[in-house]
Amino acid sequence: MSEEKFPERPGEPECSYYLRTGNCYLKQNCKYHHPKNITPSEPQCTLNDKGLPLRPGQAICPHYSRFGICRSGPTCKFDHFT
């Protein structure tokens, strides 16, 4: 199994999603820094086909429910049904 590689971009802001989850759905396309040897501070969650978090039991994201997009992206605390 090959290890997933995320871009290291010293001098750029760190990818907040990567720091929390240890994953980044943008992979090599992400413009932020992904430091090696990080320990995620939250458990990973499942993402829907748009890369938004599925959080069963949480309130549905009001922006996503209304417009089909989410301003907070993968860091949103609300559920994004499929």
Curated annotation (Swiss-Prot):
Span of zinc fingers (C3H1-type): 9-37, 55-82
A GO MF term: zinc ion binding
SUPFAM superfamilies: CCCH zinc finger
Keyword Transcription regulation: no
Domain of life: Eukaryota
Keyword set, alphabetical order: DNA-binding, Metal-binding, Repeat, Zinc, Zinc-finger
Keyword Zinc part of the UniProt annotation: yes
UniProt lineage: Eukaryota, Viridiplantae, Streptophyta, Embryophyta, Tracheophyta
Name this polypeptide is given: Zinc finger CCCH domain-containing protein 13
